């Protein structure tokens, strides 16, 4: 088991994927400096404008769905979910499901991590999840409630040595009878992250225990 490998391995794979995507887009990007200059800068104090609420494309988590989880929630239209068998762990949780944004036109994943049952505090689980990865700063925690489930959410900055940039990321956690669940949203950069936030918010808003 790759205990503690967590997002480090995933980010390496992501960078390899992006290399091909960015190479294919390089010609279109030449001569269009206006787009590059318009890309938002990651800060801990401000958030970019949010798009309208995402349209549901179905739900996951229940028995027989693409990913069977301790919780259920809606995924955005055109996003695709796939159960993960690889034993990747980050802190107290292991990767259970990846929800891919590429079919919807974005580069990134909504990833679901699940842990073993116990009496762990929800915020402690989320703090341990972030502590298991280098480059995390400016964490801002808050509580939320959805469908009778209460949880903790965090927004933070992640500094990537691989991509030589700092970008926003988000995650929320809940504790169920079957163990803790962490739902994480990254993205290529802050712009991609902001564009995918409606899908993340849809998941949090429709969250229920399975």
Briefly describe each language-model feature range.
Residues 56-63, 93, 148-156:
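Short, hydrophobic/aromatic-rich segments at coil-to-beta transitions
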Residues 126-174:
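Signature of long, low-cysteine stretches enriched in small and polar/charged residues
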């Amino acid at each position: 088991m790759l205990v503690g490998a967590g997002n480090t391995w995933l980010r390496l794979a992501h960078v390899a994927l992006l290399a091909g995507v960015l190479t294919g887009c390089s010609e279109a990007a030449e001569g269009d400096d206006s787009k590059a200059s318009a890309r938002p800068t990651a800060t801990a104090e401000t958030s970019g404008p949010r798009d309208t609420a995402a349209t549901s494309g179905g739900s996951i988590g229940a028995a027989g769905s693409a990913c069977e989880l301790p919780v259920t929630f809606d995924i955005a239209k055109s996003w695709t979910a796939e159960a993960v068998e690889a034993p990747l762990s980050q802190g107290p949780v292991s990767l259970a499901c990846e929800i891919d944004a590429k079919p919807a036109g974005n580069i990134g994943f909504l990833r679901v991590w699940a842990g073993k049952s116990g009496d762990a505090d929800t915020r402690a689980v989320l703090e341990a999840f972030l502590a298991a990865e280098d480059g995390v700063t400016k964490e801002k925690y808050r509580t939320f409630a959805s469908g009778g489930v209460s949880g903790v959410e965090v927004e933070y900055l992640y500094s990537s040595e691989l991509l030589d940039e700092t970008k926003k990321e988000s995650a929320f956690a809940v504790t169920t009878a079957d163990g803790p669940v962490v739902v994480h949203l990254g993205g290529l950069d802050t712009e991609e992250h902001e564009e995918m936030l409606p899908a993340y918010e849809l998941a949090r808003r429709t969250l229920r225990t399975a």
